[in-house]
Amino acid sequence: MAKPCGVRLSGEARKQVDAFRQNLFQEAEDFLCTFLPRKIISLSQLLQEDSLNVADLSSLRAPLDIPIPDPPPKDDEMETEQEKKEVPKCGFLPGNEKLLALLALVKPEVWTLKEKCILVITWIQHLIPKIEDGNDFGVAIQEKVLERVNAVKTKVEAFQTAISKYFSERGDAVAKASKDTHVMDYRALVHERDEAAYGALRAMVLDLRAFYAELHHIISSNLEKIVNPKGEEKPSMY
């Protein structure tokens, strides 16, 4: 029977791995002790901003510089295709500046939470002990916490997809409104997309704050088992 092959690192490689672990544990400690509480407070303050408390959603509407064609006169009904008047073309159509400004605030927050989830996942994975017989209750807790953090990360990734989808759907609506300029419903659809996006962005910030609060609760409540799953040593972040 072949002997198991152990993984051996050179002295320099071992130093680099150890340095990475130490930096990882330090980042995790800073995240839990400093970053998390401050982020919950800062998101609460962001939710109090006027930009996230718009009562009249119609005020969010961006002007659509799309000319509305005049109705054809009765004597034009029998004219040939060559004789028909051209539909006036629209020029440059910018995005909704109010929504773009709000996106500039929310998008970095989404990215930050995703990166922090990756940090926590990597940290806990480095704390999982050698698999062997014995008391694995602490390991089970580590796995449960990892499962929940991964779930949060998945939801945050869905936020990123939703932001991209907003631009795609709004772009389609604007394209239709500029092509079929006589159909007012397409213009209304553009405004509807903006109003829906505003509500979604506010909900995102609420969810981001809730996710941070959940991470703080689930990690702090189970910190002893996370950092010391076997209960053999004094619990430590390191």
Swiss-Prot record:
What GO MF terms are annotated?
Answer: endopeptidase activator activity; identical protein binding
Q: Modified residue Phosphoserine is at which positions?
A: S10
Query: Which InterPro entries does its entry note?
Result: PA28_C, PA28_C_sf, PA28_N_sf, Proteasome_activ_PA28, Proteasome_activ_PA28_N, Proteasome_activ_sf
Disulfide bonds listed in the record:
none
Gene3D superfamilies in the record: Proteasome activator pa28, C-terminal domain, Proteasome activator pa28, N-terminal domain
The entry's cellular-component GO terms read: cytoplasm; nucleoplasm; proteasome activator complex
Keywords, ordered alphabetically: Acetylation, Phosphoprotein, Proteasome
Q: What induces it?
A: By interferon gamma.
Q: Where is the signal peptide?
A: none
Q: Please, one GO biological process term?
A: regulation of G1/S transition of mitotic cell cycle
Q: Which region ranges are annotated with the description Disordered? A: 65-86
Entry similarity comment? Belongs to the PA28 family.
Question: Function of this protein?
Answer: Implicated in immunoproteasome assembly and required for efficient antigen processing. The PA28 activator complex enhances the generation of class I binding peptides by altering the cleavage pattern of the proteasome.
Quote the subunit structure annotation.
Heterodimer of PSME1 and PSME2, which forms a hexameric ring.
Name of the featured protein: Proteasome activator complex subunit 2
Q: Give the organism's phylogenetic lineage.
A: Eukaryota, Metazoa, Chordata, Craniata, Vertebrata
